[in-house]
UniProtKB/Swiss-Prot annotation:
Lineage: Bacteria, Bacillati, Actinomycetota, Actinomycetes, Mycobacteriales
Pathway: Isoprenoid biosynthesis; dimethylallyl diphosphate biosynthesis; dimethylallyl diphosphate from (2E)-4-hydroxy-3-methylbutenyl diphosphate: step 1/1; Isoprenoid biosynthesis; isopentenyl diphosphate biosynthesis via DXP pathway; isopentenyl diphosphate from 1-deoxy-D-xylulose 5-phosphate: step 6/6
Knockout consequences: The lytB2 gene cannot be deleted, unless an additional copy is provided elsewhere, demonstrating that this is the essential homolog. lytB1 cannot complement for loss of function of lytB2, but the sole LytB homolog of M.smegmatis is able to compensate for loss of LytB2 in M.tuberculosis.
Amino acids binding (2E)-4-hydroxy-3-methylbut-2-enyl diphosphate: 66, 99, 149, 189, 247-249, 292
GO molecular-function terms, A-Z: 4 iron, 4 sulfur cluster binding; 4-hydroxy-3-methylbut-2-enyl diphosphate reductase activity; metal ion binding
Enzyme Commission number(s) of this protein: 1.17.7.4
GO CC terms of this entry: cytosol
Pfam families, A to Z: LYTB
Binding site for isopentenyl diphosphate: 66, 99, 149, 247-249, 292
Name by which UniProt lists this protein: 4-hydroxy-3-methylbut-2-enyl diphosphate reductase 2
């Protein structure tokens, strides 16, 4: 008999059997780590603390993180989400999202006398600092990322005269530089590690003296979640990724699962998005979630799968995350 542990999910239990074993009964492989990263946790708590301290409304420029459930929950608590600072009443409180903003946004907020609380992920801030540093040294900066993504817009805004966006492998051939001795690549933090390295390889073939960033720009959580998916995907006929469609790191997890051997992979916002037809003939389902997804949504998916007979849950653990980021100074408790 397979040892199990109660998960608090009706009809489901955790099995200690290794991934390599293939039980005949239906099962779920549950990726660990998954869900909230340190930057998302900090950003969501920033809005919650701002509401507690100042009361509603607290304005938030763009979605604080790319997850519908999180945004809807905060909106019900009194957060008001806007696209630009011009929509915020003069003198009001505004929170900048985890994805970061360009310097022009800070200027606009100052001109409107807004009380800014910056929830930019510290790992995104690191990339901003790198962009400014290399721009000061007059480098051409090749920013690998997705056009229009808030994080890319913010990073490019730090050095608009020096940054060129490289959006995918096919964009490499369009890149031009002024001095092949002064070229560096930076990246959006939520990309596929494998695709990014493929792009870097092609860039380096064109520009042999291409410099790497001082440290890895793709965040630890993005990498960890992709590694966990790669570990379980070969065992899965189906992988379900919990996350919103505008979440870059969640979309990448679907791609990684398919690339690592899963027969099918789907992105769902919550359990009701699961199509029962996906489960036809499926014995093993992999489950993971993007870095902006609260665990309650994963629990809902596991409950739905348990109702469909997937009552054994086997964790697939590839890393243990302990990183915590301090809240913005304006919201820290006095010591």
């Amino acid at each position: 008999m397979v040892p199990t542990v109660d998960m608090g999910i009706p009809g489901a239990s955790v099995s200690s059997r290794s991934v390599a074993d293939r039980p005949n009964r239906k099962r779920v492989l549950l990726a660990e780590p998954r869900g909230y990263c340190a930057g998302v946790d900090r950003a969501v708590e920033t809005v919650e603390r701002a509401l507690q301290k100042h009361g509603p409304p607290v304005y938030v420029r763009h979605e604080i993180v790319h997850n519908r459930h999180v945004v809807d929950t905060l909106a019900k608590a009194g957060a008001v989400f806007v696209e630009e600072t011009e929509q915020v009443p003069e003198g009001a409180i505004v929170v900048f999202s985890a994805h970061g903003v360009a310097p022009t946004v800070h200027v606009s907020a100052s001109e409107r006398n807004l009380q800014v609380i910056d929830a930019t992920c510290p790992l995104v801030t690191k990339v901003h600092n790198e962009a400014r540093r290399f721009a000061r040294d007059d480098y051409d900066i090749l920013l690998i990322g997705h056009e229009g993504h808030e994080e890319v817009v913010g990073t490019a805004g730090e050095a608009p005269d020096h940054v060129q966006l490289v959006d995918g492998v096919d964009a490499v051939d369009q890149v031009t530089v002024r001095d092949e001795d002064k070229v560096v690549w930076l990246s959006q933090t939520t990309l596929s590690v494998d695709e990014t390295m493929e792009i870097v390889g092609r860039l380096r073939r064109r520009f042999p003296k291409l410099q790497d960033p001082p440290s890895d720009d793709i965040c630890y959580a993005t990498q960890n979640r992709q590694v966990a998916v790669k570990a379980m995907a070969p065992e899965c006929e189906l992988v379900i990724v919990v996350g919103s469609r505008n979440s870059s790191n969640s979309v990448r997890l679907v791609e990684v699962a398919l690339g690592a051997g899963a027969r099918a992979a789907h992105l769902v916002d919550w359990a009701d998005d699961i199509d029962s037809a996906w489960l036809d003939g499926v014995t093993t389902v992999g489950v993971t979630s993007g870095a902006s997804v609260p665990e309650v949504l994963v629990r809902g998916v596991l409950e739905r799968l348990a109702e469909c007979g997937y009552d054994i849950v086997q964790p697939v653990t590839t890393a243990n995350e302990t990183l915590v980021f301090a809240l913005p100074r304006e919201l820290r408790s006095p010591r």
